[in-house]
Amino acid sequence: MWQGVFPAVTTKFTETDELDHAEMERCFGLQMDAGCDGIIVGGSLGEGPMLSPDEKLAVFKTAKAVSGGKPVLMTINEAGTREACGRAREAKAAGADGLMVVPSMVYHADRDEAVAGLRAVAEAG
């Protein structure tokens, strides 16, 4: 099980609204060098809900490249279970060390629906 500090990192963009991989490498690397035990990408702070699936994977791969072997977790924050399961499978295939799963903010499920959705995402990833 993981322990320690796992900051949810921001996603960096260029002035032309493209992912800024060089700046992310620098910032993610600084956090790892400062003693963080892992990082979380694609969360709300990291513009996750606004990124395309390809952009989310690109940010993850940038983080993984500078992680120094420390865990990199991908946030799953999709509107529906089908989309969330798809992102979880993609994260697993890309080498994610774990997932931070956020229940849908669009559909407010009851307890049983929420548990079923989270279980489906866990099984997919």
Where are these regions (language model features)?
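Active-site beta->alpha loop and helix N-cap motifs at the rims of alpha/beta catalytic domains
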Residues: M1-G125
